[in-house]
Structures are given as structure tokens and as C-alpha cells.
């Protein structure tokens, strides 16, 4: 028979352990690193990494963005309205402890609805980062952009592919995590999709009220067609 007192004692300890782990991550990346650490030295390498986010049937005709001096810029013009790029750490929620992690390289390829309504916010945030805007200022600017409807909620069907073997999405994953597709929905909808519930294939990320909900659905193969490991064999995101 289980002893309820054990759970009552250990749950606060578990919460404390999680909080300590978050504090350690925040301490590891308290501020922006030198900008060179976020760059990919060879432009062609960044293009190839961006295209690895999706199968060639999608990425070969997609627009490709690379990180420039003031923001992302078009390196390859597209034909199918998809956009591929390599996201950096500031794509995370404003309060994420890895917001300034210079190791993050997330190959990403967004579909047309996401390119119209999700990508512009990340591109603007990148411009702010490169201009030296603080996180608190970025929060205020984001809230103001939402109020004047410059930043919009994700369109229905907004999604992105993250199927690259070669990314580094977090220190927890230590690499690319699993190949997955991401769905973007208005803030606060993770529960509507059953995200994070026991045995649910959907994971969700809820950030602040000025950021959209992101849903993660692992898939069975990488962009090159090779099989992915089962979800339980991978580290956390």
C-alpha cells in the first residue's frame, strides 16, 4: 500500500529540484553572448541547414533566410510560399532560461499561413535583438504591436517542419530532439489539444500571454527519410 505521506513530502522536493535546475540554466545564460557566437560562419552551410528542416519536396522550392547584420535576409527566393531558416535561441519564450543560449540552431520550415502570421514576429524580434533591445523592452514592444494589430494570432493551419538531424534545440535534448511538426495556435489552447496529457502524442509549450501556444507532434522519420528513434529513447526538449 502506498503511503500518501511520501508523496506529500517528495512533491515539494521535486518542485524545488525543478526550480533549481531552471535557476542553473538561467545562470548559465544570463545575458546575450557576443553576436558572433550566434552566427553560422559559412552562408552556404546556413542555407543547407535551413533546408534540412523539411523534405526536399518542400524545402527545395522554399524561400531561405539567413541571419544578416540587422536581421534575417533572403538568401534564396522561393516558389512555393514556404520559408526555411535556422532559428536562434531568442525564438524561445521571453522567460525561458535558454533565451540567450548561443548553441541553439533550430532548422525550421514554415508553411504559408505560418509565414504570414508567425514568422513576422520572430523576424521583428531578431531585429530587436541585433539592435541591442533588452528582454523587458522586447516584451513591451510585443505587447504594443499586438495592441495595434501589427502582430496577429496564428492563422488556422499554421505549422512548421523541424525534421533536421543536425539541429540543436536545447541543452536538455543535447541535439535535435525528435523530428516533429509544430502547430501554432492562439495563446492558452494547449489543453484543448490534449497537449502534455498522459500517453498523448502532442506536447505543448505555453509561454506568456503575449506569445502563441506551440504544439509539438513527433513524427517517424527525419527529412532525409531515415527512421527516427522512439520518443521514449530521447532526452527532453
List each language-model region with its residue ranges:
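Bacterial N-terminal signal peptides
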Residues: 8-16
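Primary mode marks residue(s) on the alpha4-beta5-alpha5 output face of response regulator receiver
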Residues: 23-237
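Sec/Tat signal peptide C-region and signal peptidase I cleavage site
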Residues: 17-21
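Bacterial N-terminal signal peptides that target proteins for export
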Residues: 1-8
Amino acid at each position: 500500500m502506498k503511503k500518501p505521506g511520501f508523496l506529500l513530502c517528495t512533491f515539494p522536493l521535486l518542485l524545488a529540484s525543478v526550480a533549481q535546475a531552471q535557476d542553473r540554466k538561467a545562470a548559465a545564460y544570463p545575458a546575450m553572448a557576443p553576436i558572433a557566437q550566434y552566427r553560422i560562419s559559412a552562408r552556404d552551410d546556413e542555407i543547407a541547414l535551413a533546408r534540412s528542416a523539411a523534405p526536399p519536396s518542400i524545402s527545395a522550392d522554399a524561400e531561405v533566410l539567413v541571419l544578416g547584420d540587422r536581421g534575417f535576409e533572403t538568401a534564396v527566393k522561393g516558389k512555393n510560399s514556404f520559408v526555411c531558416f535556422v532559428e536562434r535561441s531568442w525564438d524561445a519564450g521571453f522567460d525561458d532560461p535558454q533565451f540567450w543560449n548561443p548553441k541553439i540552431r533550430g532548422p525550421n520550415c514554415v508553411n504559408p499561413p505560418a509565414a504570414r502570421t508567425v514568422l513576422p514576429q520572430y523576424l521583428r524580434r531578431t531585429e530587436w535583438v541585433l539592435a541591442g533591445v533588452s528582454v523587458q523592452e522586447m516584451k513591451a514592444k510585443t505587447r504594443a504591436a499586438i495592441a495595434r494589430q501589427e502582430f496577429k494570432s496564428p492563422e488556422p493551419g499554421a505549422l512548421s517542419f523541424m525534421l533536421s538531424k543536425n539541429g540543436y534545440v536545447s541543452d536538455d535534448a543535447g541535439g535535435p530532439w525528435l523530428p516533429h511538426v509544430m502547430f501554432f495556435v492562439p495563446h492558452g489552447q494547449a489543453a484543448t489539444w490534449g497537449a502534455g496529457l498522459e500517453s498523448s502524442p502532442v506536447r505543448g509549450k505555453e509561454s506568456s500571454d503575449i506569445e502563441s501556444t506551440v504544439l509539438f507532434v513527433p513524427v517517424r522519420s527525419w527529412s532525409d527519410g531515415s527512421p527516427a528513434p522512439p520518443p521514449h529513447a530521447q532526452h527532453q526538449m
